[in-house]
UniProtKB/Swiss-Prot annotation:
Its cofactor is a divalent metal cation. It comes from Rickettsia prowazekii (strain Madrid E). SUPFAM superfamilies: Coproporphyrinogen III oxidase (SSF102886). This is Oxygen-dependent coproporphyrinogen-III oxidase. The lineage of its organism: Bacteria, Pseudomonadati, Pseudomonadota, Alphaproteobacteria, Rickettsiales. One of its GO terms (biological process) is protoporphyrinogen IX biosynthetic process. Belongs to the aerobic coproporphyrinogen-III oxidase family. A divalent metal cation binds at H106, H116, H149, H179. The record marks H179 as: Important for dimerization. GO terms for cellular component: cytoplasm. Its EC number is 1.3.3.3. It catalyses: coproporphyrinogen III + O2 + 2 H(+) = protoporphyrinogen IX + 2 CO2 + 2 H2O. Homodimer. Keywords: Cytoplasm, Heme biosynthesis, Metal-binding, Oxidoreductase, Porphyrin biosynthesis.
Amino acid sequence: MNTENKEITSNWFTNLRDLLCKEFEKIEEKYAQIKGLKPAKFVRTSWKRNGGGCGIMSLMKGEVFEKVGVNISTVFGEFSQEFRSEILGAELDGKFFATGISVVAHLKSPLIPAMHFNTRYIETSKNWFGGGGDLTPFYPEENETAKFHTAFKEACDKYDSSYYPKFKKQCDEYFYLRHRKEPRGVGGIFYDYLNSGNFEQDFAFTKDIGKALLSVYPEIVRSKLFLPWTAEQKEYQLIRRGRYVEFNLLYDRGTKFGLMTDGNVEAILMSLPPVVKFN
């Protein structure tokens, strides 16, 4: 396993965490200032993994972001015997290293889309990058969806013109609730097992995906910061959030990976909305 690669990827995810938290706090500060409220701040909680590694949860509950989490982790060790066959390159000795960032935002306003994003670097006897970002609006708007997709398409096109259509398709297929026969949101991109043979290029691409999120999602939130919404719209948001819960508990690979590697349960389930209704 390459020590330098592990260090620089882990450092980037920490840096991206800081940039995102700063941007989200600025949005809370602006809203609080105009409304005469005390702005919310991120609260950080560190955790250690028994088998090796650690992580930091950054969680904020405010007036704009009902719940937003920005988690980073770096873990290592050996996969359990039954899990090795499910992970690329882990079949022989089960050794692994994984570092990454996971971001989930649930907004108070039902007019502002929820957002999920993660990027990661994993080493076994193989090594690869994975991740992506997707948008879940409760009241979809074509221009907003196009803006989100364009940000990721531009990042993809810098490296390979085939990336965006391929990763968009993978996102649409992945974030699909098979038992309901419906998509979770309006998509984005999703990629896994990315290893072109050029580590520097794959890492640069993964960094640009993070920068794309940083450029587009805060802009979407700000554009709807002060739009009025109704109790009926809020009720609909709470019911649709149930789909988010269903997906994360039934299908999400990150949830399964975290639980199977003895990760921090609170960090793993950070993605769940704070309030949900099931009819």
